[in-house]
């Protein structure tokens, strides 16, 4: 039994104490082909049961050069890993390390290969996607990469962006939203909360007004755009008034897709030392936000009835609109 991933990176000794665990591999070590080759061949792996290096010392990220995804029509391309920010509730930087970007040329070549294999949509992914390029020569921005991909891969039908931090979105990114129809009009925002005091205690870099203005700005550029968001319920010190501001933010930003996280204390984080909210209250608030999420999603979907949409088929009966809404067909499509 081999344990790897962020939990193993953060607490390797905890897993090594489990008698059923044979090896513990860090996030860097799991990318070493020789380890897996030795396991597959039955050859002995290095003597140490725990092989976890200092993730903060890693300065490069290995791009996931995947040539196919079975019968899927959508492919995911990792362009960035790690995070340089230190939100008070989060342990991701200690599991993934500092922000590291895949060079633009490598990204473009991977996308070209996937398009040649018939993939119609590419999704750019990363831990902190909008920080892409900060560690590369000349410090290019994400908007530059988007523009380059769309220019150099003309046969790509759809380019989709995964979760972004709106405060880091650059002008070239905004220009692409306004002018490039192949850039899909759906953006998932890392908002986390709707109250300024809680945002400061989270050590986020934006305020609620920043989020509202960003959504308004993008809607002016691309009226058909939709937004999703991550929101945490029950962060330490969150009062009823603070929570109500998260509820209001859903309407003020016009969000249609909500990803709700009940706050979960992570040992060693600053938030873990703050006054905690009762678990029953956290659960109740998360349920309220999820209920609101279902309501706004249903409203958006009902508004699409009778409208024409371009749909990318994922199977003979299932597809997605450009805004990522799911479409079910009553009979199989070729």
Task: Specify the residue positions occupied by each region the protein language model found.
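Proteins enriched for Cys/Gly/acidic motifs involved in redox and nucleic-acid/cofactor modification
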Residues: 1-132, 147, 172, 187, ...
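Residue-level signal for inorganic ion chemistry
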Residues: 6, 33, 124, 161, ...
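Conserved SAM/AdoMet-binding glycine-rich loop
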Residues: 10, 116-240
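Glycine-centered loop/turn positions within well-structured domains
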Residues: 31, 85, 130, 196-197, ...
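A generic structural signal for well-ordered coil/turn residues at beta-strand boundaries
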Residues: 71-73, 183-185, 257, 307, ...
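Contiguous mid-protein beta-loop-alpha structural module that forms a pocket-lining wall or clamp
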Residues: 238, 253-255
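Terminal RNA-binding accessory module
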Residues: 273-334
